[in-house]
């Protein structure tokens, strides 16, 4: 047990899928897993363990922003022996060639947060996903006939940013999606010897203001979850 997770030892699988919303974690567990057990509920940050096609997998929410997700990721790795974390969530985009409902695999994550500089002695840390996990996710998407984009994300500290000019910089540098957690999770995984990947569905376009409906979000979200889950099985077979 930790101050933030009240699961007993051995309650989590070695692979954990992490959406931001704890209710989305519950949805994933109840929709895609079998033999589901709720293993933690401190602060209503729900966590579950079950099986997917016979493979033990856990699902747990991580909240919003790098500070929140970093706490949960660290404790899962160091206190519960988790080896792989897959963040599954939504993101915005600033690029006109990236569309709402696209699925993005975050090979790397830029950030305006200083957390990785703090842990890396004020030097720049290249926050990247585990290559094998990213490759497995691409293979899972291809097997489903789903197109995915692969590249850089931007993990922002501010949801309501006053610096709209930064969107132009992101577009120039080819940032595929804007979210709030990937760089932190990649940093934590690197620090504690684990592996991590982020998969996002584009829910809104920052330039055009196009947004998905609740029903559309659920449909595309399901594609992303199936890609993430199947990627675990592919990774096991490699």
UniProtKB/Swiss-Prot annotation:
Keyword Transferase (UniProt): yes
Sequence positions that bind a purine D-ribonucleoside: 4, 179-181, 203-204
Keyword Transferase: yes
The protein's Enzyme Commission number: 2.4.2.1
Coiled coil regions, renumbered to chain: none
Amino acids binding phosphate: 20, 24, 43, 87-90
Reaction catalysis annotation: a purine D-ribonucleoside + phosphate = a purine nucleobase + alpha-D-ribose 1-phosphate; a purine 2'-deoxy-D-ribonucleoside + phosphate = a purine nucleobase + 2-deoxy-alpha-D-ribose 1-phosphate
Keywords from the UniProt entry: Glycosyltransferase, Transferase
Subunit structure: Homohexamer; trimer of homodimers.
Functional note: Catalyzes the reversible phosphorolytic breakdown of the N-glycosidic bond in the beta-(deoxy)ribonucleoside molecules, with the formation of the corresponding free purine bases and pentose-1-phosphate.
Listed name of the protein: Purine nucleoside phosphorylase DeoD-type
């Amino acid at each position: 047990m930790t101050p933030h997770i009240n699961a007993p030892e051995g309650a989590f699988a070695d692979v954990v899928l992490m959406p931001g919303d704890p209710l989305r974690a519950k949805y994933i567990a109840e929709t895609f897993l079998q033999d589901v057990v709720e293993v933690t509920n401190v602060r209503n940050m729900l966590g579950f363990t079950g099986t997917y096609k016979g493979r033990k997998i856990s699902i747990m929410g991580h909240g919003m922003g790098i500070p929140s997700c970093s706490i949960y990721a660290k404790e899962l790795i160091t206190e519960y022996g988790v080896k792989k974390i897959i963040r599954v969530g939504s993101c915005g985009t600033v690029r006109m060639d990236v569309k709402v409902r696209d699925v993005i695999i975050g090979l790397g994550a830029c950030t305006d947060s200083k957390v990785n500089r703090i842990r890396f002695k004020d030097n720049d840390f290249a926050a990247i996903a585990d290559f094998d996990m990213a490759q497995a996710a691409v293979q899972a998407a291809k097997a489903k006939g789903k197109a995915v984009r692969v590249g850089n994300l931007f993990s922002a500290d501010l949801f309501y940013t006053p610096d709209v000019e930064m969107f132009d910089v992101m577009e120039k540098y080819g940032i595929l999606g804007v979210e709030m957690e990937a760089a932190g999770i990649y940093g934590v995984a690197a620090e504690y010897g684990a592996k991590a990947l982020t998969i996002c569905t584009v829910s809104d376009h920052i330039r055009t203001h196009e947004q998905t409906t609740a029903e559309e979000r659920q449909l595309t979200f399901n594609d992303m979850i199936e890609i993430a889950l199947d990627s675990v099985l592919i990774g096991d077979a490699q």
